[in-house]
């Protein structure tokens, strides 16, 4: 018999039902569960797949560069970044006739095009690219890297080049390589690019391979470096009247501490960013030399962790046993990596708009909104994944004997206290926040808005004041105009910072009031509830009072038969499943808040947000309903406009989202009967019956139906909001 899918599991391949396909897809990446897997093959498969992932990333970024060079308008955008709309790529086949062709022909293009809201134009411009040829060169280089990555992945699966398990578990060498080799060297290389190419480019000097050895990045060359007069590199920075991309008002400094933003581009000073990357490079190059490898000097991770026993005895045996637990569990390591990556992705979202790094991106409002929302959603999925793999670690890899009385075991021992505290925090936040919103709703409904309960966020305002915001009148730390810190800030360090904080047209320390106070606590409710579900799922993954033997059932079990009440819906997978709904809900509130606050800031009517955000009807009517009007008018009796594609996506997103409920709520047997009926009709229809249906249809398992429902819910939710966000922002700001 020919090999059937899935090849990695003979048991599944012989299953005569549709389970074969579903379970095959579900376990394709669960290498640990495959036939004939060994620890060595497991590590080698994961290692090789990393190269495949890199190849895909390089191919994708190469495609971005290639399509903009081929079909975009980069060169004309560079001439006037604030008024030319950047083109992502052409639309080959615009449906709906001539009106569609006209609606989508913009940005100076000859035919229908898509506008870029990803910020790549601003990024490429900032780092010194200027022509289509530059973009093609970059695309080819990344294509080359993609091919190299594929070859490397294939190579490391060949017997001669397969690394051993001991190589994968050599924590110190990996730390040194990642810290120095990846972070340190790449940050240093990026500093080099900024100093040699980007900064001269911002001053009208076009540096390429043919002249980069002749153009001095700084008039004094390397002299100040070798004589220790490093401050010379900071002297004569670009002036406030500097026109980006020209020599007008340009200085000669390459590494500065100006603070604040370039007045024309509204982005951070390139010379500040070069300085930042140089400092990062230095720190990581040092950090990558701290761990003991071939030379018998430096730290051993195991010794470090074994020594971490707090003397008070309140953490028991501290970190004893953690080294082997972490180093031998891929799921623990993946959980740590996902948690870190999730947090950093959310930080990227917060910093991209408040401290924009790319020239003119702060004035491209739709791009700002799209990038913020994109990074927050990505962060949410990555963070929930961290807890999922934490739970799998507890089920598959945790060894109680190895971790006796250390911090990990103690966390499991007092999980009731952790879970109940999180529960209490969630209940407190939920009831109080909803109570305030609903009270305010009722007051407005009864025509007595002055009876709202409006709470000023005085602690947050105090923190903003401490960082230099003067409008609240707190007169503390950096906002105290006669204090030593304030005076030093004016002259020695970051003189531009205080100007930027108090300039009301950017997004640094937005002025906050009662509406912000309420939505902050609504978001806190979402964060705490999501965390509660995820933490409970992981801490109860091995067992609970109700089901002490839970770990024997694996990560995703539906129930333990009809004879054991209460064992349904309590697997670690169910916790992940529930948490994703809360995560999406929370990020919905976060992005609504960000978007509405910024729309009113950009339009110059901040009072609309301040007055309407203190009650729920305000959010529903003045944010969602009011801003969806343009979107819904993408098609109307008079024809169509360039928002029509978002109108269609908005409807389609709702459709996908609603489809999710059919799987989340319907009986699963309904689907089995439906599929059987379709199969019956299929086999009795000429031509169609040439393709035989081999697998007997069986109902989706409970877990599968939930997964399909969750996938539709998530995808539909994000599609719907993406269309709303882009249409409502681009419809207002051209």
From Swiss-Prot:
Chlorophyll a B3 binds at residues 662, 670. P700 is a chlorophyll a/chlorophyll a' dimer, A0 is one or more chlorophyll a, A1 is one or both phylloquinones and FX is a shared 4Fe-4S iron-sulfur center. The keyword Lipoprotein does not apply. Belongs to the PsaA/PsaB family. [4Fe-4S] cluster binds at residues 559, 568. GO terms for biological process: photosynthesis. Keywords: 4Fe-4S, Chlorophyll, Chloroplast, Chromophore, Electron transport, Iron, Iron-sulfur, Magnesium, Membrane, Metal-binding, Oxidoreductase, Photosynthesis, Photosystem I, Plastid, Thylakoid, Transmembrane, Transmembrane helix, Transport. It comes from the Eukaryota. NCBIfam families: psaB. Phylloquinone binds at residue 671. It comes from Nandina domestica (Heavenly bamboo). Chlorophyll a B1 binds at residue 654. This is Photosystem I P700 chlorophyll a apoprotein A2. InterPro entries: PSI_PsaA/B, PSI_PsaA/B_CS, PSI_PsaA/B_sf, PSI_PsaB. The chain crosses the membrane at residues 46-69, 135-158, 175-199, 273-291, 330-353, 369-395, 417-439, 517-535, 575-596, 643-665, 707-727. PsaA and PsaB bind P700, the primary electron donor of photosystem I (PSI), as well as the electron acceptors A0, A1 and FX. PSI is a plastocyanin-ferredoxin oxidoreductase, converting photonic excitation into a charge separation, which transfers an electron from the donor P700 chlorophyll pair to the spectroscopically characterized acceptors A0, A1, FX, FA and FB in turn. Oxidized P700 is reduced on the lumenal side of the thylakoid membrane by plastocyanin. PROSITE patterns: PHOTOSYSTEM_I_PSAAB.
